[in-house]
Amino acid sequence: MVQMASDIERLYIDEEVRDVFLQAYEEDYERKSDLACDVVDCGYLLPPVKCIMDNGDKCYKGGVVDNKGNFVASSRHWRGGISGAMLEGYPFSMSEASFEDIEVLYGGILINHFGHFLVEGLSRFWYWVQNKEKNFDVVFFNPKHKKIIPQFWEFMEILGISKNKVHIVSSVTRYRRIYVPEVSHQISTYYHKEFLLPFSYISSKIAARDSDKIYLSRTKFNNGTLCMGEELLEKVFKENGYQILYPEQMSLKTQISYIKGAKEIAGVIGTATHLEVFARMGTKSIILERSDTPIKEQALIHQAIQANWYSVGANMNPFPIEHSIGPVLLGITENLKGYANKCGMSINSDMIGYVKKSYARKFLKLYMQPVSYTHLR
């Protein structure tokens, strides 16, 4: 019988922050309670309106209210803090609301970021999967009125929900019946067993590729956090038999087909590694950490899919950085060398600690700027 590694043995992280990572990975994120779905007859959808708290935090008012104007608590939007939350409705004229004589499934706030839509935007769709025969129309809010990400429509297509059954609600609207499922997941906080239902259903519609070992690269990704030096990591994994993939150059179906077929998945932590929600139970996952702060959402996903996971420090940042802002310096670290030695990978020891001068200069230049530089290249 093969003995599984303990959590501490899975961490190839600098000693001074290892306990922080260990705590994140030892946390139990699963909630055992049953989920429910509120059914609201002749209820109203109130598009979110922005409000500013006394401390400056921005939040929303809106959601679902019943035919007496009472807020339906299960329609709230909560991400662990008041910023961006939607916890109550607001006064409105029932007589002026438009009426749609259809039954709809409430999807909540549509987050126009692929990674966040992936793990948050489908958290109510467990009920859709369990009740496919109802052929629901679905309703979402788009409070920032941004162009909807193409992956949203790809998800709807794979689920079998046509565009004419998707409603982005922008004015107060009454519906014959609104189904309001509880969320199956709160980012970085908890998940229910139903969390994986939409992903399992989507995955069942797509044939797996015989991809064995894959590396999800960011080197051709021109948005999001600036990461410099990943080409060195990519080279290491390519030389050790991993197929290099560039997710942003693939359709969603193609990405899922590779994830579904892979026995081992490696990559710098981010949206691409969150795609492991489509992986098989027990898949090996090698997460290359880009900061000294653990991303609890990845630990949550690992628990949900029972991953054979490893967390490997790959950042060369001379100063503390914020995961979602950067800039990030990546390279071949002693941590990666330690993982390679343990798992039988070959690595060029001469490259340990190497950073291109141009990357170092760019890091310092951007780090000292007092403005956001997330999308600078």
Placement of each model-derived feature along the sequence:
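The feature primarily captures lumenal catalytic ectodomains
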Residues: 1-376
